[in-house]
Amino acid sequence: QGLISFPRV
């Protein structure tokens, strides 16, 4: 994936 995904904690 080219989009930066932020880890959801």
Curated annotation (Swiss-Prot):
- Organism phylogeny: Eukaryota, Metazoa, Ecdysozoa, Arthropoda, Hexapoda
* Entry function: Mediates visceral muscle contractile activity (myotropic activity).
Q: Which organism is it from?
A: Mantis religiosa (Praying mantis)
Q: Could you say which protein family the record assigns here?
A: Belongs to the periviscerokinin family.
Keyword check for Secreted: yes
Q: Which residue positions does Valine amide occur at?
A: 9
GO cellular component assignments: extracellular region
Protein's name in the database: Periviscerokinin-1
Residues recorded as bearing Pyrrolidone carboxylic acid in the entry? 1
Cross-referenced InterPro entries = Periviscerokinin
What keywords sit in the KW lines?
Amidation, Neuropeptide, Pyrrolidone carboxylic acid, Secreted
Q: Which branch of life, at top level? A: Eukaryota
Compartments, record wording = Secreted
A single GO BP term for this record reads:
neuropeptide signaling pathway
